[in-house]
Amino acid sequence: MKRTKIVATIGPSSSSKEVLKDMVLAGMNVCRLNFSHGAYEDHLEVIKNIRSLNDELGLNVAILADLQGPKIRTGEMQKSGVHLEVNEIVTVQTDNVVGNEKVFSINYLRLPKDVNKGELILLDDGKLMLEVIKTDGKKQITCKVIQGGELSSNKGVNFPNTKISMPSLTEKDEQDLSFAIEQDVDWIGLSFVRSARDMIDLKHKISSAGAKAKVIAKIEKPEALECIDDIINESDGI
Protein backbone atom coordinates (compact mmCIF):
# COMPACT_ATOMS: atom_id res chain seq x y z
CA MET A 1 0.00 0.00 0.00
CA LYS A 2 1.31 3.45 -0.89
CA ARG A 3 1.99 5.32 2.34
CA THR A 4 3.16 8.60 0.83
CA LYS A 5 0.20 10.89 0.17
CA ILE A 6 -0.18 13.81 -2.23
CA VAL A 7 -1.83 16.82 -0.59
CA ALA A 8 -3.12 19.53 -2.92
CA THR A 9 -4.24 22.99 -1.80
CA ILE A 10 -7.45 24.00 -3.55
CA GLY A 11 -7.91 27.58 -4.72
CA PRO A 12 -10.31 29.44 -7.03
CA SER A 13 -8.74 28.03 -10.19
CA SER A 14 -8.99 24.42 -9.00
CA SER A 15 -12.31 24.33 -7.15
CA SER A 16 -14.59 23.24 -9.99
CA LYS A 17 -15.67 19.62 -10.13
CA GLU A 18 -14.04 19.18 -13.54
CA VAL A 19 -10.63 20.36 -12.37
CA LEU A 20 -10.89 18.45 -9.09
CA LYS A 21 -11.66 15.28 -11.02
CA ASP A 22 -8.52 15.75 -13.11
CA MET A 23 -6.51 16.25 -9.93
CA VAL A 24 -7.98 13.16 -8.29
CA LEU A 25 -7.24 11.04 -11.35
CA ALA A 26 -3.71 12.45 -11.43
CA GLY A 27 -3.10 11.19 -7.89
CA MET A 28 -4.37 13.73 -5.35
CA ASN A 29 -5.04 11.90 -2.07
CA VAL A 30 -5.89 14.82 0.20
CA CYS A 31 -7.75 18.02 -0.61
CA ARG A 32 -6.40 20.88 1.55
CA LEU A 33 -8.70 23.79 2.35
CA ASN A 34 -6.67 26.83 3.38
CA PHE A 35 -8.72 28.77 5.91
CA SER A 36 -6.41 31.76 5.57
CA HIS A 37 -8.35 32.48 2.38
CA GLY A 38 -11.82 31.95 0.96
CA ALA A 39 -15.35 32.16 2.30
CA TYR A 40 -17.22 29.26 3.87
CA GLU A 41 -19.42 28.91 0.79
CA ASP A 42 -16.27 28.44 -1.32
CA HIS A 43 -14.96 25.70 0.97
CA LEU A 44 -18.38 24.07 1.13
CA GLU A 45 -18.56 23.86 -2.65
CA VAL A 46 -15.19 22.09 -2.77
CA ILE A 47 -16.26 19.67 -0.04
CA LYS A 48 -19.43 18.80 -1.95
CA ASN A 49 -17.49 18.31 -5.18
CA ILE A 50 -14.89 16.05 -3.57
CA ARG A 51 -17.51 13.88 -1.90
CA SER A 52 -19.46 13.63 -5.13
CA LEU A 53 -16.30 12.52 -6.94
CA ASN A 54 -15.52 9.99 -4.20
CA ASP A 55 -18.96 8.44 -4.76
CA GLU A 56 -18.65 8.46 -8.54
CA LEU A 57 -15.10 7.09 -8.69
CA GLY A 58 -15.21 4.77 -5.69
CA LEU A 59 -12.33 6.61 -4.04
CA ASN A 60 -11.70 8.13 -0.62
CA VAL A 61 -9.96 11.45 -1.19
CA ALA A 62 -9.63 13.01 2.26
CA ILE A 63 -10.44 16.60 3.18
CA LEU A 64 -7.99 18.59 5.31
CA ALA A 65 -9.11 21.83 6.98
CA ASP A 66 -5.95 23.86 7.58
CA LEU A 67 -6.54 26.48 10.28
CA GLN A 68 -4.84 29.83 9.82
CA GLY A 69 -3.38 30.15 13.30
CA PRO A 70 -2.25 33.40 14.93
CA LYS A 71 -1.35 36.02 12.30
CA ILE A 72 0.71 39.01 13.34
CA ARG A 73 0.91 41.77 10.74
CA THR A 74 2.30 45.24 10.22
CA GLY A 75 -0.09 48.16 10.47
CA GLU A 76 -0.70 50.90 7.95
CA MET A 77 2.40 52.21 6.19
CA GLN A 78 2.92 55.28 4.06
CA LYS A 79 0.99 54.82 0.81
CA SER A 80 3.90 53.70 -1.35
CA GLY A 81 5.53 51.70 1.43
CA VAL A 82 8.85 52.50 3.08
CA HIS A 83 12.44 51.36 2.63
CA LEU A 84 14.27 50.06 5.69
CA GLU A 85 18.03 50.50 5.39
CA VAL A 86 20.51 47.97 6.79
CA ASN A 87 21.99 49.01 10.17
CA GLU A 88 19.35 51.71 10.70
CA ILE A 89 17.36 51.81 13.96
CA VAL A 90 13.58 51.39 13.76
CA THR A 91 10.89 51.35 16.45
CA VAL A 92 8.14 48.73 16.37
CA GLN A 93 5.14 49.72 18.48
CA THR A 94 1.67 48.47 19.37
CA ASP A 95 -0.03 51.87 19.16
CA ASN A 96 -1.39 52.55 15.67
CA VAL A 97 0.74 54.88 13.57
CA VAL A 98 1.21 55.44 9.85
CA GLY A 99 4.56 53.72 9.40
CA ASN A 100 7.71 55.30 8.03
CA GLU A 101 11.44 54.53 7.98
CA LYS A 102 11.75 55.16 11.72
CA VAL A 103 8.61 53.66 13.26
CA PHE A 104 5.75 51.31 12.36
CA SER A 105 3.05 49.40 14.23
CA ILE A 106 1.99 45.77 14.57
CA ASN A 107 -1.31 44.23 15.64
CA TYR A 108 -0.09 42.12 18.59
CA LEU A 109 -0.32 44.03 21.86
CA ARG A 110 1.72 41.63 24.01
CA LEU A 111 4.77 41.57 21.77
CA PRO A 112 6.86 44.03 23.86
CA LYS A 113 6.37 41.65 26.82
CA ASP A 114 7.23 38.55 24.80
CA VAL A 115 10.42 39.57 22.96
CA ASN A 116 13.93 39.76 24.37
CA LYS A 117 17.13 41.48 23.33
CA GLY A 118 18.91 39.66 20.50
CA GLU A 119 15.82 37.95 19.10
CA LEU A 120 14.92 38.31 15.44
CA ILE A 121 11.81 39.72 13.79
CA LEU A 122 11.09 38.63 10.22
CA LEU A 123 8.90 40.81 8.01
CA ASP A 124 7.06 39.99 4.78
CA ASP A 125 7.85 36.25 4.66
CA GLY A 126 11.43 36.84 5.78
CA LYS A 127 12.32 39.37 3.10
CA LEU A 128 13.32 41.82 5.85
CA MET A 129 14.96 41.04 9.19
CA LEU A 130 15.24 43.06 12.39
CA GLU A 131 17.19 42.34 15.58
CA VAL A 132 15.73 43.43 18.90
CA ILE A 133 18.00 45.89 20.71
CA LYS A 134 15.66 46.60 23.60
CA THR A 135 12.00 46.54 24.61
CA ASP A 136 10.14 48.68 27.11
CA GLY A 137 7.92 45.72 27.96
CA LYS A 138 4.82 47.80 27.29
CA LYS A 139 4.39 49.36 23.86
CA GLN A 140 7.69 49.78 22.03
CA ILE A 141 10.54 47.65 20.72
CA THR A 142 13.76 49.18 19.42
CA CYS A 143 15.33 47.20 16.59
CA LYS A 144 18.31 47.24 14.23
CA VAL A 145 17.71 46.46 10.56
CA ILE A 146 19.75 43.37 9.66
CA GLN A 147 18.24 42.74 6.24
CA GLY A 148 16.61 45.75 4.61
CA GLY A 149 14.11 46.30 1.84
CA GLU A 150 10.68 47.64 1.02
CA LEU A 151 7.94 47.25 3.62
CA SER A 152 4.26 47.96 3.00
CA SER A 153 1.01 47.67 4.96
CA ASN A 154 -0.44 44.43 6.34
CA LYS A 155 2.65 42.25 5.86
CA GLY A 156 3.21 39.12 7.92
CA VAL A 157 5.49 39.27 10.96
CA ASN A 158 7.25 36.16 12.33
CA PHE A 159 9.42 35.52 15.37
CA PRO A 160 11.72 32.51 14.93
CA ASN A 161 13.32 32.81 18.38
CA THR A 162 10.46 34.24 20.45
CA LYS A 163 7.98 32.32 22.56
CA ILE A 164 4.74 34.08 21.72
CA SER A 165 2.14 34.01 24.50
CA MET A 166 -0.95 34.33 22.32
CA PRO A 167 -3.26 31.26 22.19
CA SER A 168 -2.70 28.70 19.45
CA LEU A 169 -6.36 28.95 18.40
CA THR A 170 -7.57 32.45 17.56
CA GLU A 171 -11.20 33.53 17.52
CA LYS A 172 -11.20 33.02 13.75
CA ASP A 173 -9.71 29.54 14.18
CA GLU A 174 -12.47 28.64 16.64
CA GLN A 175 -15.11 29.64 14.09
CA ASP A 176 -13.32 27.83 11.27
CA LEU A 177 -12.95 24.72 13.43
CA SER A 178 -16.68 24.70 14.15
CA PHE A 179 -17.40 24.95 10.42
CA ALA A 180 -14.95 22.16 9.61
CA ILE A 181 -16.46 19.90 12.27
CA GLU A 182 -19.96 20.60 10.95
CA GLN A 183 -18.77 19.45 7.53
CA ASP A 184 -17.24 16.29 9.03
CA VAL A 185 -13.81 16.82 7.46
CA ASP A 186 -11.23 14.07 7.81
CA TRP A 187 -8.27 16.09 9.05
CA ILE A 188 -7.65 19.33 10.96
CA GLY A 189 -4.29 21.08 10.56
CA LEU A 190 -3.04 23.35 13.36
CA SER A 191 -0.57 26.07 12.38
CA PHE A 192 2.41 27.32 14.42
CA VAL A 193 2.24 24.47 16.94
CA ARG A 194 4.45 25.20 19.96
CA SER A 195 3.76 22.35 22.38
CA ALA A 196 1.90 19.10 22.88
CA ARG A 197 -0.69 21.07 24.86
CA ASP A 198 -1.73 22.83 21.63
CA MET A 199 -2.60 19.47 20.10
CA ILE A 200 -4.27 18.16 23.26
CA ASP A 201 -6.51 21.23 23.37
CA LEU A 202 -7.41 20.86 19.69
CA LYS A 203 -8.28 17.18 20.09
CA HIS A 204 -10.42 17.98 23.12
CA LYS A 205 -12.43 20.52 21.14
CA ILE A 206 -12.92 18.03 18.32
CA SER A 207 -13.99 15.16 20.58
CA SER A 208 -16.24 17.45 22.66
CA ALA A 209 -18.12 18.25 19.46
CA GLY A 210 -18.61 14.54 18.79
CA ALA A 211 -16.31 14.58 15.76
CA LYS A 212 -13.60 12.11 14.81
CA ALA A 213 -11.30 14.23 12.64
CA LYS A 214 -7.61 13.43 12.93
CA VAL A 215 -5.09 16.18 13.69
CA ILE A 216 -1.93 17.35 11.94
CA ALA A 217 0.68 19.46 13.73
CA LYS A 218 2.39 21.99 11.49
CA ILE A 219 5.94 22.49 12.74
CA GLU A 220 6.84 26.09 11.89
CA LYS A 221 8.61 27.42 14.99
CA PRO A 222 11.97 26.37 16.49
CA GLU A 223 10.44 26.06 19.96
CA ALA A 224 8.33 23.16 18.69
CA LEU A 225 11.54 21.19 18.12
CA GLU A 226 12.29 21.38 21.83
CA CYS A 227 9.32 19.10 22.53
CA ILE A 228 8.87 17.45 19.14
CA ASP A 229 8.50 13.93 20.56
CA ASP A 230 5.64 15.02 22.80
CA ILE A 231 3.96 16.82 19.88
CA ILE A 232 4.30 13.70 17.71
CA ASN A 233 2.75 11.58 20.45
CA GLU A 234 -0.33 13.83 20.51
CA SER A 235 -0.70 14.10 16.73
CA ASP A 236 -1.91 11.87 13.92
CA GLY A 237 0.45 13.50 11.45
CA ILE A 238 3.21 16.10 11.21
Positions of the model-derived regions?
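Non-catalytic helical/linker scaffolds that mediate oligomerization, partner binding
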Residues: 1-238
